[in-house]
Structures are given as C-alpha cells and as structure tokens.
Amino acid sequence: MAKPKIGLALGSGGARGLAHLGVLSSLHKHQIEVDMIAGSSMGALVGSFYAAGHDVATMKKVAKAFKRRLYADYTVPKLGFLKGDRVRQLVHAYTFGKPIEELQIPLGIVACDLQTGEKIVFRKGSVSDAVRASISIPGIFIPQRLDGRLLVDGAVVDRIPVSVVKDMGADIIIASDVSRVRKTETAVHIFDVIMQSMDILQNELVRHQTIAADIMIRPSLETYSSSSFANIEEMISAGEEATNRMISKIRKEIENWEGS
C-alpha cells in the first residue's frame, strides 16, 4: 500500500528553534518518517543537520556544547555585526561538505533577496552557503552574497515554509511554529533589540496568516528568548511534549490519506 510523503516545515525563531529538535525526536520515537524538510533561519540550520543524517541525540550534544561567543565573528558594523563565517564552517563540517541535493533527506532552505524582496528557495548547491543566507538576521549578520544576490534571513518572507514542502511534493505537511514572542521588560544588548523587534513583527504576520499545514505544532516557548541559548534542554523538551500531544492526530491524517 502506498504511503503518504510527509513534509516537515521548520520555522524561524532564533534560539527557540532548538525546540525543533524535540519535534524531530518525538516523530522518530513514534516511527513517523519525515520524507522532506523545509526550513527558515534556525529551522534551516536544524533541518540541514537532520537531512545530513545526524540523529537527534547527536544534534542535542552539538546544541548543548554551543557557545554563542565562539561563533560571534564581529566585524565593523556596516551591513551587520557578524560576518557569519564561523557558522558557515560549522554547517559545512556537520553536513560533510555535501551539496543540498546529496543529503539523505530532500531539503529546501529559504532566504530573502534584500534588493527585490523575492523569496529564494535553495534545493541544490552548497548547504553551508544556503544556511548562512537563511540565518542572516538583518542588522546582526552581514547579508550573504550569493549568485549575484544579496540575501537575508528567510523569515523576512516566509517564517514557516509550508508552501515549500508542498511544492517539494509532500502529501501531509507538519509545521513547527516557534514564533511565540517572549514578554520581556529589559533589552540588555543591541541583539536583544533587533531580535525582539523581528519577533514582534513576524509573530503578527504569522498570527494573521493562513498557514496551510495539516498538522501545526506550537511548543510552549513564551518564557524563552530568541537570543539566549541558556535553556536548551527546556526548549527541546517543549518541542517534544508539543509533538507528543499531536501524534494521534498525525496518525489519523496518515490513516485517512491511505484510505482515500
């Protein structure tokens, strides 16, 4: 009997995107196989590691060992504070230098052309370059120059890239939304100002947008900052718990598709 192709759309959200690891962990534990992934920003980073064949346990170790200061390659702030070379090197290493089209799971990576406002979806070529473009938070990272374009964070045009996995051929689409805005009183760093501003803007866009996913997973992340990696285990657990609650619904979607 034919099986539906399951697509997973991983949304942006800065550090909160680590909750995607919990989503992937739950799906794996319940033997729900993901056939294709699309990601914006942190969703692209997590998706690229998983598509390269890393299991969630390995990805958790990488996340817990992450120290933002080690990857903060500051530069004179003309177009952004961070060059992003160290993050690119990290992605290159953990995706084994492979192009997107050679990863174990088909992957779509979303970025935005800063000059035209066009959504750019990478389905082939360098994984590390595409992810570097997708995480280029305006004002923080220098935009990525690639193929004659100046590219910034995919979340600017598509925070939860459901349409991308649909175009990739998914029959059932699961989306992970980590866009809940943290209610904060104090911004202690310019990064906090930029991230909170982006969060508020994009949270409003998501709130007023119809997202055509069959299953929408929304981990409870309101108390966590998008710019802080201090609560990694808690954010991963939130993603896993939210997905566990949706497993029966996912199974029903699969059963209904098979019976149609």
Curated annotation (Swiss-Prot):
Family indicated by similarity: Belongs to the NTE family.
Every PNPLA domain range: 8-166
Motif segment (GXSXG): 39-43
Taxonomy, superkingdom: Bacteria
InterPro entries associated with the record: Acyl_Trfase/lysoPLipase, LysoPLipase_patatin_CS, NTE, PNPLA_dom
UniProt record, GO biological process: lipid catabolic process; phosphatidylcholine metabolic process
Motif DGA/G per record, residues: 153-155
Active site (catalytic residues): 41, 153
Keywords, comma-separated and alphabetical: Hydrolase, Lipid degradation, Lipid metabolism
GO MF term list: lysophospholipase activity
Protein name stated in the entry: Uncharacterized NTE family protein YlbK
